[in-house]
Regions:
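Bacterial N-terminal signal peptides
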Residues: 8-18
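Bacterial N-terminal signal peptides that target proteins for export
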Residues: 1-9
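Hydrophobic small-molecule pocket/channel-lining residues, especially in calycin-type beta-barrels
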Residues: 2, 21-225
């Protein structure tokens, strides 16, 4: 792991631990409502827009099956009609440069994504995931709960899709844990991805968002499911 990235990760982990443990009682939850947009540095662009170079799998603990899947990728396939409007997986869509809106209710937290006009629904209040044989979708099935002032989201039932736009994919057995913590106008997401098929170990992503009160609605950017 790159030393600079490791140090940033350590700082972020410490921030989340302090924020989630120091604020309020269990029933005192923050309000995530409103529009948010990712905070990215120029060097992040290669991992978001066109994607990193083919063969650049640094930082990802790929299994033999995952490496074979990545090496079989053909970039021309992205331009096939059936793939042009294919939504990103939740493992990737949260890293999009497009903004999103959070609609917060006691029993449901909804994330309206401008990217491909996708909607993520986080079921609160002790809801369980559906049976394993339930059909998978691009956004999967998400359940959530509060740990102090941190929102913890667990997602399953995601259609096989790409983690990076250079062939790295996750299988339909992927499970995603997201931990969202707000500090004023900033929202920190710590994402852990586990996939027993294409990865040999869990891997983590850290993403920061800024509250955007200047945005009043999302622009149409349709994709099909």
């Amino acid at each position: 792991m790159d030393r600079q990235y490791f140090l940033i990760l350590v700082v972020c982990v410490g921030l989340v631990a302090n924020l989630s443990g120091a604020w309020g009682a269990e029933g005192d939850v923050p309000d995530f409502s409103g529009f948010w947009a990712g905070m990215f540095e120029p060097e992040d662009q290669q991992y978001r827009g066109p994607g990193p170079d083919f063969g650049d799998f640094r930082g990802l603990p790929l299994s033999e099956a995952g490496l074979a899947k990545a090496k079989s990728w053909n970039p021309d396939d992205d331009y096939l009609p059936e793939n042009l409007s294919k939504p990103h997986s939740p493992t990737n869509i949260m890293r999009s440069s497009f903004p999103f809106e959070v609609i917060q209710e006691p029993d449901m937290i909804t994330l309206r994504m401008e990217s491909c006009e996708q909607v993520r629904r986080v079921h609160m209040g002790g809801v369980s995931h559906p049976p394993a044989e339930t059909p998978h979708t691009f956004m999967g099935h998400s359940i959530g709960h509060w740990e102090g002032r941190t929102l913890v989201v667990h997602t399953t039932h995601i259609i096989e899709n790409y983690v990076r736009r250079n062939g790295v994919a996750h299988s339909e057995e992927v499970q995603l844990e997201e931990r969202y913590t707000r500090d004023g106008d900033y929202l920190l997401l710590m994402m852990t991805v586990e996939d027993p098929v294409y990865f040999s170990a869990p891997f983590m992503r850290v993403i920061a968002f800024r509250h955007r009160p200047d945005i009043t609605d999302l622009r149409p950017y349709p994709c099909g499911e």
